[in-house]
């Protein structure tokens, strides 16, 4: 993140915002700058990517599903806009430690004895490390002692759109992002790779809420895509993984996506449109939700 801060200082903060007497490496100035940069970056990334996904990827037929809430898109956006600043405050504390030199982030490929190969290995390691810890954090957030207060707001959206991707309780959002920030404190990682992965991870988070259930058949058993995550929203206690199905299989929480079996929400909408199913005006009761004509436990 110091690469971003350096650019922001050079082009904006130093010439236009802060007095010349306030050094760029002052910890309080860095904290303020990081808070601004993180919030602005988060909003730009969220609105740009989620909007593109909503208009060009998301299947709007899903909005006809009886579990799709009234004014849902507006509510998802409002929830996210209110949550992101609080998530950023917690995140900035870790960014500050990183730019103050407490992590193993570096900008010299020479620090990798095996060059590009080791760089690729670090990326793969990052993905598997974060996927493992996010699985257990996410699963822990479904525990009855914390679910209602922290994670339930994200499960309001049974048929999520890309705008639901970051609609978290701030503590929930921060906890699920924590493995990304912990990794470079344990393992060496190139700064550009770290920043790139941070952006890509946020785009991936949007993509698994986009309602596009297509995955190359050869990858379906391994990749935790939108079909898997939509079933997680619908069925509650399956498919906690972020990128891969590995830990769901190990933890006994893997569920083959209903969409792959022709029983997903799009199939439901199609049957409803053809008159084979009736449309329900409500969205279920307090503890149960309608899915594919049956009630399924959600909490």
UniProtKB/Swiss-Prot annotation:
Transmembrane region(s): 32-52, 79-99, 117-137, 186-206
Pathway membership: Steroid biosynthesis; cholesterol biosynthesis
Membrane topology summary: Multi-pass membrane protein
Domain called Fatty acid hydroxylase: residue spans: 124-252
Motif (Histidine box-1): 138-143
Superkingdom assignment: Eukaryota
Residues bearing the modification Phosphoserine: 253
Extent of Basic and acidic residues compositional bias: 286-299
A single GO molecular function term of this UniProt record: iron ion binding
Reaction it catalyzes: a Delta(7)-sterol + 2 Fe(II)-[cytochrome b5] + O2 + 2 H(+) = a Delta(5),Delta(7)-sterol + 2 Fe(III)-[cytochrome b5] + 2 H2O; lathosterol + 2 Fe(II)-[cytochrome b5] + O2 + 2 H(+) = 7-dehydrocholesterol + 2 Fe(III)-[cytochrome b5] + 2 H2O; 5alpha-cholesta-7,24-dien-3beta-ol + 2 Fe(II)-[cytochrome b5] + O2 + 2 H(+) = 7-dehydrodesmosterol + 2 Fe(III)-[cytochrome b5] + 2 H2O
Location of the motif Histidine box-3: 228-233
The keyword Transmembrane helix belongs to this UniProt entry's keyword annotation: yes
Any one biological process term the GO annotation gives: cholesterol biosynthetic process via lathosterol
Enzyme class, first EC level, given as a word: oxidoreductase
Cofactor (UniProt): Fe cation
Pfam families: FA_hydroxylase (PF04116)
Enzyme Commission identifier(s): 1.14.19.20
Short motif Histidine box-2, span: 151-155
Function text: Catalyzes the penultimate step of the biosynthesis of cholesterol, the dehydrogenation of lathosterol into 7-dehydrocholesterol (7-DHC). Cholesterol is the major sterol component in mammalian membranes and a precursor for bile acid and steroid hormone synthesis. In addition to its essential role in cholesterol biosynthesis, it also indirectly regulates ferroptosis through the production of 7-DHC. By diverting the spread of damage caused by peroxyl radicals from the phospholipid components to its sterol nucleus, 7-DHC prevents this form of cell death.
Entry text on domains: The histidine box domains may contain the active site and/or be involved in metal ion binding.
Name of the featured protein: Lathosterol oxidase
